[in-house]
Amino acid sequence: MKKSILALSLLVGLSTAASSYAALPETVRIGTDTTYAPFSSKDAKGDFVGFDIDLGNEMCKRMQVKCTWVASDFDALIPSLKAKKIDAIISSLSITDKRQQEIAFSDKLYAADSRLIAAKGSPIQPTLDSLKGKHVGVLQGSTQEAYANETWRSKGVDVVAYANQDLVYSDLAAGRLDAALQDEVAASEGFLKQPAGKDFAFAGSSVKDKKYFGDGTGVGLRKDDAELTAAFNKALGELRQDGTYDKMAKKYFDFNVYGD
C-alpha cells in the first residue's frame, strides 16, 4: 500500500510539473538587439552570445520549450512583439511605466543604470550647463533616448539617435559625437574595456530617473500571454534560487548585476 501511495504521489508531482508548462508553444521566438555586448551580440561564427542569451536559453530549458533567437534593431522590438513576429523580448529592456502601457514584463532580470561616456580628460558632465551645444548619441527607441529628448534636447543639447549601439560607438570614436548616453554595464564591458574604447571613459556619475529608467530590465511579453509570462517568472525564480543565475553572471561581471 505504501509503495502504491508513493508511486501515485510521484506521478502526480510529475504531472503537475509538466502541466504547469502545458499551455506554452513548442518554440518561443525571442527578439534581441545584438549590438549590446555583453548582454547580446554575435560571435565570429554568427552565434548569439551574452548574458541575455544565457538567461533566455536557461529559462527556455526549464520551461521545456525551444528558444529561437531573432536579431532586431532595438526600436523594432516592441512593434515586432505586438505584431506577433516574436513572442518575447530579452534585450536589456527596462521596465518603465510607459512601456507597461503597451506590453507586459516578467520579474526583474537585472539592474540598469545609465551613464555618459566621453573622451578621456573631457570636462563633460551629465548636466544641462555642460551639455548645451554638444552632440550626444543615444540608441533609438531606448530609455536613454526618451530621457535625453525630454530633458536635454529642448535646452540646446543635440541628441542624435542611432539604429544600433555599434553606430553610436563608431561615431563617438570618430569624433562626430561629444558624448554618448547608454546602459552603464554595456558601456563598460562592450566599449570601454575594448580596444575601440581605450581613449574614452565615463563622464560623471550615473543618470538616475525612475520615470524613464524604471527599476531594472525584464522579459517583454504581450499582455494577453499570461501563461508565457508566468512560465518565464517561474523559470527565473528557480534559477535565481538554485544559484544558476549567480554562476552565469560571474562569467560576465565582477559585481552584483542584479542590484538591490
UniProtKB/Swiss-Prot annotation:
Could you describe the subunit structure of this protein?
The complex is composed of two ATP-binding proteins (HisP), two transmembrane proteins (HisM and HisQ) and a solute-binding protein (ArgT).
Q: Does the keyword Transport apply?
A: yes
**Species this chain originates from:** Escherichia coli (strain K12)
Quote the function comment for this protein: Part of the ABC transporter complex HisPMQ-ArgT involved in lysine/arginine/ornithine transport. Binds lysine, arginine and ornithine. Stimulates ATPase activity of HisP.
Family, as annotated:
Belongs to the bacterial solute-binding protein 3 family.
What GO cellular-component annotations does this UniProt entry give? ATP-binding cassette (ABC) transporter complex, substrate-binding subunit-containing; membrane; outer membrane-bounded periplasmic space
Q: Which domain of life is it from?
A: Bacteria
**Protein name per the record:** Lysine/arginine/ornithine-binding periplasmic protein
* One Gene Ontology biological process: ornithine transport
Q: Pfam families in the record, alphabetically?
A: SBP_bac_3
